[in-house]
Amino acid sequence: MATTSLDLAKVRNIGIMAHIDAGKTTTTERILFYTGVSYKIGEVHDGAATMDWMEQEQERGITITSAATTCHWPLEDNDYTINIIDTPGHVDFTVEVERSLRVLDGAVTVFDGVAGVEPQSETVWRQADRYGVPRICFVNKLDRTGAEFHRCVDMIKDRLGAVPIIMQLPIGAEMDFKGVVDLVRMKALVWSAEAAKGEMYDVVDIPATHAEAAEEYRGKLVETVAENDDEIMELFLEGQEPTEEQLYAAIRRITIASGKGDGVTVTPVFCGTAFKNKGVQPLLDAVVRYLPTPLDVEAIEGHDVKDPEVVVKRKPSEDEPLSALAFKIMSDPHLGKLTFVRVYSGRLESGTAVLNSVKGKKERIGKIYRMHANKREEIEAVGAGDIVAVMGLKQTTTGETLSDDKNPVILESMDFPAPVIQVAIEPKSKGDQEKLGVAIQRLAEEDPSFQVHSDEETGQTIIGGMGELHLEVLVDRMRREFKVEANVGKPQVAYRETIRKTVERVDYTHKKQTGGTGQFAKVQIAIEPITETDGPAYEFVNKVTGGRIPREYIPSVDAGAQEAMQFGILAGYEMTGVRVTLLDGAYHEVDSSELAFKIAGSQAFKEAARKASPVLLEPMMAVEVTTPEESMGDVIGDLNSRRGQIQAMEERSGARVVKGLVPLSEMFGYVGDLRSKTSGRASYSMQFDSYAEVPRNVAEEIIAKAKGE
């Protein structure tokens, strides 16, 4: 059995990011085919793609789970290991994307050559900016009617604010697309019609028809590189032409550096058509040439277990103590629970004990696997910089840190958004009851954006997620993987409540002093709205002095206020954006207790919230509709009728794009209405934007319904 200490300079941990349908899974499939892992090319069209291994993904033709796959690629006499994290492109699964980005060193962003930069492309681009992930771009589908390489490059510049370095020019357009001009080597790469799977291509002189454009764009390439790299700038100013090697090295430096700073992202752009097997091998060369190794990435930062203020750094070396992040949990039908782990420092060995430093619990490492999309290879140990799947972790959930128990560290935790949509779910029979509990527990372990609670009044189980598709897929998985038959209610919007006014003082005394052990707690609190846009959902400030309330009771007041926030004043929805200040209080030597102060905190909060002008908030979705011009009036009218606010309109490749903010509650069933209004020619995407106050007339209806009036 293999034990692996890879040469980290020859490792690339990459993700492939894109908008749904840009051809991301097809591109990944081709990469796996050309790197020799997959002997048959899996097509998304016929549901056979290797990465899309969950049944629902194969039916829907979209990628839901980021499966980690290891493959190998030779370049210039070296063999490189590429770990690919396949990320979903549908907005309901942005949590998966965030989680994958956290463990990547670099990424390939795939764009649809016809549609260009689409809404979800912007979302994942911004997420990659936030995590400082260096990127290269691949403009795909150049064989399609309406594909325009240069328009797509302009959109990368204008809509993403990036600086593209055009590395290739297409040879031929649409159906006649047959290869690319390599602007560094100044050669043409042409795929012959005979090699149906595109495994062979010829490196030839640039055709005369493309010579002038090649010269022009080669000049632009050198200029862009010079503007971003001092070494090439010196050559440029001296009038010297850089060599291939100098350009490769400079583009690598620029690509890696642009992920680190807060400056503009500079990104090499390649092109091809994955479906027609053209342009994928040069893309693999580019992954190796330009994307960072684990050694290029700065030391991972975490914090001390006892003191979150103390920063702890770990270099990507096997000599450092172990630090690893669990970024994905999956249920394998044969192996049970698998935890996908990125090792940042030290070594992870099968059969050893490690510490889950978030929970303070010891875990035993079972078998370690290198995963292909749906096949596996067992290894004994794994070193820094690698990504593997581990068996045997019982307590570890997504986003938690595994470390050496003598040198514990907590790596930066991931914050996941609260669900915006909920449905009630109940088992069809007694036999399904237990299975439903197991299914929900497993799915919640795998997916932190999937949340579960019981409705105290109805006793129903409520599940929440990031959108209708997200919940559909989860319910579908319950049925297929856990054999649970369940009735699912209508989707409900996750409203919130907040306050608009500051209440400077509310006194509350909790007293029960008749017979038996008494209870006594007196608190005085103030509450105010948290107005900062990125402020916390809740904040507790303690201003009690002189021991008026003993220190051990203060957290109970905080806990009581937080408990009261779970069920708002108006309609019982969770409250958000409230700062509670504990000003004063009193206690009794015998009768005071943690429980008494918790009750006092809870009741004082409720009283204060009633006086603080409570309002209802609703999730607003950023909606983008692409429609033929003749249907534009109908589309805008329809969005207005749904209480939408139109924010922008633009033209994109012959169609009109309408952007707006629309309440989620008004968007149920929108796909059918849009189809009928535009004869099926329009498409839309939406994602959560923010919470906004509900207009009074609508709020009154929601409140009345919640109270059962």
From Swiss-Prot:
Q: Which GO terms describe its molecular function?
A: GTP binding; GTPase activity; translation elongation factor activity
User: Which GO cellular component terms are attached?
Assistant: cytoplasm
User: Where is each tr-type G domain found?
Assistant: 9-295
Q: Where does the record place it? A: Cytoplasm
Keywords, alphabetical: Cytoplasm, Elongation factor, GTP-binding, Nucleotide-binding, Protein biosynthesis
Cite the Pfam families for this sequence: EF-G_D2 (PF22042), EFG_C (PF00679), EFG_III (PF14492), EFG_IV (PF03764), GTP_EFTU (PF00009)
UniProt-listed CDD domains: EF-G, EFG_III, EFG_mtEFG1_IV, EFG_mtEFG_C, EFG_mtEFG_II
The GO annotation for biological process reads: ribosome disassembly
Q: Which domain of life is it from?
A: Bacteria
Look up the signal peptide feature and give its range: none
Q: Where does GTP bind?
A: 18-25, 86-90, 140-143
Q: What's this protein's function?
A: Catalyzes the GTP-dependent ribosomal translocation step during translation elongation. During this step, the ribosome changes from the pre-translocational (PRE) to the post-translocational (POST) state as the newly formed A-site-bound peptidyl-tRNA and P-site-bound deacylated tRNA move to the P and E sites, respectively. Catalyzes the coordinated movement of the two tRNA molecules, the mRNA and conformational changes in the ribosome.
Give the family, as the similarity comment puts it.
Answer: Belongs to the TRAFAC class translation factor GTPase superfamily. Classic translation factor GTPase family. EF-G/EF-2 subfamily.
Record's NCBIfam families?
Answer: EF-G, PRK12740.1-3, PRK12740.1-5, small_GTP
This chain's protein is named Elongation factor G
Species name: Streptomyces avermitilis (strain ATCC 31267 / DSM 46492 / JCM 5070 / NBRC 14893 / NCIMB 12804 / NRRL 8165 / MA-4680)
The lineage, from the top, is: Bacteria, Bacillati, Actinomycetota, Actinomycetes, Kitasatosporales
